[in-house]
Amino acid sequence: MKPSPRRKARELAVQAVYSWQVSKNPVNDIEVNFIADNSKRRFDIEYFQLLLRGVTTNIGSIDEAIIPYVDRPLDDIDQVEKAILRVAVFELKDCTDVPYRVVINEAIELAKSFAADDSHKFVNGVLDKTVKLIRPQE
């Protein structure tokens, strides 16, 4: 089964955030390149842009939400795991139309696809704790 356009947008957003973290290139350049490089793929461009811009613009508050629930400094977290967590936390905070279970499940699936073997367990644990702070009403 093909991934939905929104799932593909999340996947590309994680890759773009990773690229931004590692390269320190301007976000606009990364965004333009990702859209151009993936022009033939079916994905939700607006959602991709929302996630990428949202993470890079709100990085301080996103990291503040993550820090209490990790057992090491953010700089010591694998770059892929960090990108996944940042996209998911932004989505939890700012995309309240998306159920938190969907956000966490998508992040787990991304970790299984792109990160180290047991990364999905780490991502799940951090997000499970973070969601209680961000969306206590759910």
From Swiss-Prot:
GO terms for cellular component: cytosol. InterPro entries: NusB-like_sf (IPR035926), NusB_fam (IPR011605), NusB_RsmB_TIM44 (IPR006027). Transmembrane segments: none annotated. Keywords: RNA-binding, Transcription, Transcription antitermination, Transcription regulation. One of its GO terms (biological process) is DNA-templated transcription termination. Pfam families: NusB. GO terms for molecular function: RNA binding. Belongs to the NusB family. Involved in transcription antitermination. Required for transcription of ribosomal RNA (rRNA) genes. Binds specifically to the boxA antiterminator sequence of the ribosomal RNA (rrn) operons. This is Transcription antitermination protein NusB. It comes from Colwellia psychrerythraea (strain 34H / ATCC BAA-681).
